[in-house]
Amino acid sequence: MIYEICTQTDPGLTRDNNEDAVAFDAATRLCILADGMGGYNAGEIASGMAAAFIKSEMGRWLSQAGRHANAKEVRRAMEICVENANHSIFNAANSNPQYAGMGT
């Protein structure tokens, strides 16, 4: 089966910069969309971090265990990846004043 993936994001009418991020892992057919928190600091950084982190971690998990996993195991792996991405973003925001308050 051949997949064709197209993505497009739009900052909308209120914001000048686009704070959304999209990532795709062809090997695992994993697609991630992270929506930066508009109106807050560095939303584009947070969404980029989240998309990259989840692509890496969930992609690795799917490559190793995903073929034999049931829906409950996949859901739990997704929850863990999102929680870990959130911790990473929170730590970056606390370590860098220019990222204070960022989120996705």
Where do the protein language model's features map onto the residues?
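PP2C/PPM-type serine/threonine phosphatase catalytic domain
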Residues: 1-104
